[in-house]
Amino acid sequence: MEEASDWSAGQMCLTAPVPVLEEWVVARTAHYDRSFLSTDPTFAHAHLTVLAPWVPEPGVADLARVGEVLAAVPAFEVELTRVATFPDGLVHAVSEPDHGLRSLTRRLAAAFPDHPPYGGRYDATGGPVPHVTLDRLGPDVTEEWVRAEVGHLLPARLVVDRVDLQWWGNDTCRRLHSWRLGA
């Protein structure tokens, strides 16, 4: 039987897919918790979070509002330049420049003020830092190890031209909707 601490009710997330890191992120997800592997072939495990947690049960008006916001934003490029670690031990790929992603997050957060990025956890520090989660520091995981493992994939240029609505939950991860930027 699952321990309560190992189970998640889940959350809605607005994300931008990062295909170049998909294989790595899927492998690391499988290493830690296979229940977060999606069987949905359109689901992007490797992603840049744009806004999460988002509306728990979005309606037609919520989806339309996201579409309106994204229609006003043209596609833009970012580069995943290097591996770094946040103070909490989250090892990630740094996205530079990050102004396009920050702007996208600000626009969506303004459209949904009851759903601040990461629940408002990073408001005092200027907002969340756009990144792709790669791993977490631990006895067998160092930043140097992750850098050596993904070094051949970085730097990587990425065109952010789509935002997906994803459901993240144990054994239920899936893509629910997708919007093109500037469309």
Residue ranges with predicted function:
Residues 166:
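Active-site/acyl-donor-binding loops of N-acyltransferases
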